[in-house]
């Protein structure tokens, strides 16, 4: 019995197996990919059910598994660099035209339901309620070295300063996070208390959402 794989999973499986995609094209209504072997296959093991674990950078630079409801096709996490190089970033720091997200995933993200499992990380002491979002290695590498070091001084959070400042560009996102982190390191409780109520107010009463 033949199984049809969606495009993101095809590309993700190639990167998982150590290939880099050179080009994609349709030839006589057939989807074709040219790829080049670059490295050894990943040794990571995955279960692509409803609940997934994503490797993120936490306090002191330690990597941990963030729990989320799956919103993307299987193996999509291996396409971050490829999507960034070909699509760049959209307003708000998200990938432009991110075809890795499923139709159901768009709904989960719009309603924030995909992030509910991150309370598991908070209960495990890996995250806190307010703080900068835990980043993948690929996205973390886009930040300035100064902000990278500042970020790993604290635990990441569920409610980011993004919803206070609503920055558009990567530079503005970094400035928003820098402002929060510097304030937090000086006055931890006061800063998180102030940011929490600003975030809640902006989301509930001003309708602010990630773009």
Q: How does the language model describe each region?
A:
Residues 16, 22-79, 189-211:
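A hydrophobic, helix-centered structural microdomain
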Residues 54-99, 159-179:
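Short, glycine-rich, amphipathic interfacial segments at transmembrane boundaries or analogous
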Residues 43-44, 117-211:
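Hydrophobic structural segments characteristic of membrane proteins
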Residues 1-18:
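Short alpha-helix
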Residues 100-125:
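Short, conserved beta-strand/loop elements in beta-sheet-dominated catalytic cores
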Residues 55, 104-110, 182-184:
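Short, well-ordered beta-strand elements within core beta-sheets of diverse protein domains
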Residues 7-8, 28-30, 101, 113:
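Conserved glycosyltransferase catalytic-site signature
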């Amino acid at each position: 019995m033949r199984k049809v794989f969606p495009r993101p999973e095809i590309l993700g499986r190639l990167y998982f197996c150590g290939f880099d995609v050179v080009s994609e094209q349709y030839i006589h209504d057939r989807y074709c990919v040219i790829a080049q072997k670059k490295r050894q296959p990943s040794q990571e093991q995955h279960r692509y059910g409803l609940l997934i674990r994503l490797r993120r950078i936490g306090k002191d630079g330690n990597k941990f598994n963030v729990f989320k409801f799956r919103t993307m096709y299987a193996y999509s996490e291996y396409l971050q660099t490829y999507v960034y190089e070909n699509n760049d970033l959209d307003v708000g720091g998200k990938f432009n035209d991110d075809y890795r997200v499923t139709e159901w995933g768009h709904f989960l993200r719009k309603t924030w339901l995909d992030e509910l499992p991150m309370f598991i990380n908070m209960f495990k002491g890996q995250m806190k309620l307010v703080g900068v979002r835990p980043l993948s290695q690929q996205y973390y590498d886009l930040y300035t070295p100064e902000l990278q070091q500042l970020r790993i001084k604290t635990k990441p959070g569920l409610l980011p300063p993004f919803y206070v400042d609503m920055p558009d560009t990567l530079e503005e996102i970094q400035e928003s996070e820098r402002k929060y982190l510097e304030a937090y390191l000086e006055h931890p409780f006061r800063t998180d208390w102030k940011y929490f109520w600003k975030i809640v107010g902006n989301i509930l009463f001003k309708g602010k959402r990630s773009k």
